[in-house]
C-alpha cells in the first residue's frame, strides 16, 4: 500500500495535507511523544508529582481521535472485537507477562533499587507506612483503577494503534510490531533504568537492559492481543492485566506491612 492511498480518507480534513499512516508520520509522532514523555517522567521522578504524566496519557489517547477520521480510527483497531472472548485471554496474557518479569527481577536483582518493581514502588508518593489491611486494599484498588485505565488506553491507542499502522504499509505487520514494541520499551527507560537517587541521575546498565528487553517482549504480547481479538481493545486489556499484576505485587509483595 502506498502512502497516497493511506492518507486522504484516514485523517480529518485539517491534517490530511500533512499527515498519513506512513513512516514519516510515525517517526514524527514517536520523536515528539518520546521527548515530551521523557521530560515529564524524569521531572516527576524528582518532584514525586505525576499529575502531568497522567495528563500526558490522556493526550496520547485523544491524539488518534483528534487526528483520524472514522476510517482511520477503524484502521488502527478502534472497533468492537471480532472475538470478544479473546479479551479475557488478553487480560490473562498481560498478567502472566508481568508475573514473569516480577519473578526474573527477584531472581536477578533482589529487593534493592536495581529491581524495577521496588524502584517503582518508591514513586507511589504519599502512602502511609506501614499500612493496615483495610488501607492497603483501598489504596490498591485506587492505584489499580488508575493503572488499568490511563496508560493502557493512552499507550495502546498510540503504540499498537496509530504508530503501528504508520509503519505497516512499508514494513508489514510483523516488523511494524517490532518498531512499536521497541519504541514502547525504550521510552520506559524514563520510568526505570535511568533512575533518580540522592546523588543525582544514575544509569543501571544491567537492570536497564533487562527492563527494556522485558518490555519489548511485553509489547509484542500486546500486539498479539490486538491481532487475536481483532480490536485495539485486546491490547488495552493485555496492558491493563500487566498493570494490575504490577500494582498487586507492589502493594502485597513490596510495600511493608502493618
Residue ranges and their predicted role:
Residues 36, 40-44, 68, 101, ...:
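Membrane-water interface at transmembrane helix exits
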Residues 75-151, 169, 199-203, 256-258:
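Juxtamembrane helix-loop-helix connectors linking adjacent transmembrane helices
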Residues 17-29, 53-57, 86-90, 136-144, ...:
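Residue-level signature of transmembrane alpha-helical entry/exit and packing/kink sites
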Residues 23-27, 31-35, 39, 88-107, ...:
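Hydrophobic, lipid-facing residues on alpha-helical transmembrane segments of integral membrane proteins
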Residues 1-89, 95-96, 244-258:
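N-terminal, membrane-interfacial amphipathic/helix-forming hydrophobic leader that caps
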Residues 138-258:
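Transmembrane helix-loop-helix hairpins at the membrane interface
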Amino acid at each position: 500500500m502506498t502512502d497516497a492511498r493511506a492518507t486522504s480518507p484516514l485523517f480529518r480534513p485539517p491534517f490530511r495535507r500533512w499527515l498519513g499512516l506512513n513512516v514519516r508520520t510515525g517517526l514524527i509522532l514517536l520523536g515528539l511523544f518520546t521527548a515530551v514523555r521523557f521530560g515529564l517522567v524524569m521531572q516527576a521522578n524528582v518532584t514525586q508529582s505525576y499529575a502531568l504524566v497522567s495528563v500526558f496519557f490522556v493526550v496520547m489517547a485523544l491524539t488518534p481521535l483528534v487526528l483520524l477520521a472514522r476510517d482511520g480510527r477503524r484502521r488502527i483497531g478502534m472497533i468492537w472485537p471480532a472475538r470478544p472472548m479473546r479479551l479475557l485471554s488478553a487480560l490473562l496474557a498481560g498478567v502472566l507477562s508481568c508475573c514473569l518479569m516480577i519473578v526474573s527481577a527477584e531472581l536477578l536483582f533482589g529487593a534493592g533499587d536495581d529491581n524495577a518493581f521496588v524502584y517503582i514502588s518508591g514513586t507511589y508518593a504519599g502512602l502511609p507506612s506501614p499500612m493496615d489491611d483495610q488501607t492497603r486494599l483501598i489504596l490498591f484498588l485506587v492505584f489499580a483503577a488508575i493503572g488499568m485505565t490511563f496508560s493502557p488506553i493512552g499507550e495502546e491507542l498510540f503504540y499498537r494503534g496509530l504508530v503501528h499502522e504508520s509503519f505497516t504499509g512499508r514494513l508489514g505487520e510483523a516488523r511494524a510490531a517490532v518498531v512499536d514494541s521497541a519504541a514502547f520499551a525504550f521510552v520506559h527507560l524514563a520510568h526505570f533504568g535511568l533512575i533518580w537517587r540522592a546523588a543525582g541521575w544514575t544509569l543501571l546498565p544491567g537492570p536497564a537492559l533487562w527492563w527494556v528487553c522485558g518490555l519489548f517482549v511485553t509489547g509484542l504480547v500486546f500486539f498479539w492481543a490486538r491481532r487475536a481479538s481483532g480490536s485495539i481493545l485486546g491490547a488495552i486489556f493485555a496492558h491493563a492485566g500487566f498493570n494490575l499484576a504490577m500494582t498487586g505485587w507492589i502493594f502485597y509483595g513490596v510495600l511493608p506491612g502493618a
